[in-house]
UniProtKB/Swiss-Prot annotation:
Motif DXD per record, residues: 185-187
Role according to the record: N-acetylglucosaminyltransferase involved in the Golgi-specific modification of N-linked glycans.
GO cellular component: Golgi membrane; vacuolar membrane
Chain positions carrying an annotated carbohydrate: N254
Gene that this sequence comes from: gnt1
Protein name (Swiss-Prot/TrEMBL): Glucose N-acetyltransferase 1
Location (main, coarse): Golgi
Superkingdom of the organism of origin: Eukaryota
Compartments, record wording: Golgi apparatus membrane; Vacuole membrane
Topological domain ranges for the Cytoplasmic compartment: 1-39
Residues on Lumenal side: 58-384
Protein source organism: Aspergillus fumigatus (strain ATCC MYA-4609 / CBS 101355 / FGSC A1100 / Af293)
Residue ranges of the TM segments: 40-57
Family membership: Belongs to the GNT1 family.
Alphabetic keyword roster: Glycoprotein, Golgi apparatus, Membrane, Signal-anchor, Transferase, Transmembrane, Transmembrane helix, Vacuole
């Protein structure tokens, strides 16, 4: 008697269905299958979009754009001023150039110009350059003209001197009708507005460091001074300056350490608010260096002359012994002073000369902008 072969799918309990019945499934139309697949795809798409929307709305909100806490339209600008002084025709033109830059950059603060009391605003003829420049400063650039006594500028030189050595900038401390005065050396190129300095935290003075002397000394540089005018401070500084005014001390002609810097450091070295020199104290001599650790304050940043210039608010012309840019220099000296290229300098294959290009552009720009002044003759000195 043979055994009956067991089926692969035995009968279910309480079920009359057989294996043949299980596979007896009617054919489903292709259209119905396609519709079912589309519904599944649509469901997954909807689910994915839903998840994306949840993640989108839960994302971290972007930081708001920085907004100045000062509404410049509501500022009483008559309480703030920039100051300049002139000890010669050359420096008078420089001062006018600074006023032109401030005007062009949209500064709304007052402008004050100290000048020798023996000058006047009467233009006698076409050769009376000083009077023409004073009128230009007053009428076009709305400068307040303040005559000063000869003793305040006798430490300075004439038009042919490249380096001004007077202490007339200290007069800005006596302008007590203003809440704050910003004094800028006139041998600069102003690149960006600096009106934000009027709203620094309270401090008698704010100055950048003479960073080129770091880390050996932490001398403050007088190329830019933010001042809270005070009769007490003015009187104290004038008393300190008496030896220089009366010829009892020799005023140094070297740009690296001037007498006004010495006076200001003696009084404010430990109390001044220090301004970042990258923005407010850059000097042209930095583009001639290969070691920029004093400028950066570290040894890991990479020097990029274009980036450095873009961050600067002003640049001070300081390339001793090269004279200032309004003085024609000897070509031999100029060749020695020019920034060196990074690769094979002095050869036909030299490359990496961007420092030189930026440095030359600063001097060329200064001379080009000097056309704002009535025809000032080019000065020749022992250098040219």
């Amino acid at each position: 008697m043979g055994n009956k072969k067991a089926t692969l799918l035995p009968y279910r309990r309480d079920s009359a269905s057989s294996e043949a019945d299980f596979f007896d499934i009617p054919d489903e139309p292709c259209l119905a299958i396609a519709k079912r697949q589309l519904r599944r795809i649509r469901t997954w798409i909807f689910f994915a979009v839903f998840i994306i929307l949840i993640l989108w709305f839960r994302r971290e909100a972007p930081s708001p754009a920085p907004v100045s806490h000062i509404d410049y339209n509501k500022v009483d600008w008559s309480r703030y001023a920039y100051s300049q002084y002139a000890t010669s025709s050359a420096y008078l033109c420089n001062a006018v150039m600074v006023f032109e830059a401030l005007e062009r950059l949209g500064s709304r603060a007052d402008r004050v110009l100290f000048y020798p009391e023996d000058w006047d605003l009467f233009v006698a003829d076409d050769h009376d350059r000083d009077s023409q420049l004073l009128v230009l400063a007053k009428e076009k650039y709305k400068a307040l003209l303040v005559p000063i006594s000869a003793e305040m500028i006798k430490a300075g030189g004439g038009s042919g001197e490249s380096w001004d050595k007077s202490i007339a900038k200290l007069l800005a401390f006596g302008e007590t009708e203003y809440d704050r005065v910003i004094h800028i050396d006139s041998d600069v190129t102003v690149l960006q507005s600096m009106d934000e300095l009027f709203f620094l935290p309270p401090a008698k003075v704010a100055m950048p460091r003479a960073y080129w002397a770091l880390p050996d000394t932490k001398t403050l540089s007088s190329l830019l001074i933010v001042i809270e005018p005070s009769y007490r401070e003015f009187k104290a500084l004038m008393e300190s300056a008496q030896p220089a005014l009366h010829g009892q001390v020799e005023v140094d002609s070297n740009e690296t350490q001037r007498y006004d810097m010495e006076l200001l450091n003696n009084r404010y070295a430990d109390s001044a608010l220090v301004l970042p020199h990258r923005q407010y104290g850059l000097v042209t001599g930095e583009f001639r260096k290969k070691d920029h650790r004093s400028f950066f304050g570290n040894d890991y940043e990479t020097w990029d002359p274009d980036k450095v210039l873009a961050e600067a608010k002003l640049v001070h012309f300081s390339d001793w012994p090269l004279p200032k840019p309004w003085v024609l220099s000897n070509q031999k000296l100029l060749a020695e002073i020019l920034p060196k290229c990074d690769f094979k300098p002095g050869t036909m294959q030299e490359r990496g000369c961007r420092d030189r290009e930026v440095w030359k552009s600063l001097y060329e720009d200064f001379r080009r902008r000097r056309k704002v002044c009535p025809k000032i003759r080019t000065i020749h000195t022992e250098y040219g």
